[in-house]
Amino acid sequence: KAVAMYQKALEQKIDNNEKRAGVIKQLSDCYLAKEDYSNAIKYYQDYLTTLGNASANDAAALAQIYIQYADTLSDTARIDMFKKAEQVYVDMEKKYPDALEYVTFMRARVNSYMDPETKEGLAKPYYEKVMGMIEPRAEKSASDNARLVECYRYLGYYYLLKEDKATSTSYWNKILAIDPENEIAKQALTLTTK
């Protein structure tokens, strides 16, 4: 019902691009709520084009739709959708340099989704880059620490799989320095001492 209403609204002459973009976004949101990802993506792309001056948050939302869609797919189609999400982040890196840390972090996540068993280490360079951005800060926010824990967890697991126990151990210990009660790090350390 809402989809028909918004489509009818789009047929009307809307003299303001911002208002038109708002209607298009509502239409995309309706399709997203119905899990009709193809149409949600199509209309969201139309929204970004109509808006013209999209923010980093607007662009990132498109990547999130691709990620949600990928979660409903399998095999090659799933990977292809994750690659589309990553391409949004690549484009954001150029267009929104102030969002570099966020974009790099999200590229790490998307690459970890494409390599869930960490066999290829696709996310490794991105997590390392995020680490390099955050670690030098004298004051770290809760968000900074959460990102570091995710980086360290990925890298700790990566090196555990590579049987580099010393490097793996160093990452698990870094997690415990931030979160002394972290159960995953505690359990992983028992594996690195065997």
Where are these regions (language model features)?
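TPR alpha-solenoid repeat register
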Residues: K19, V23, N57-D58, A99-V103, ...
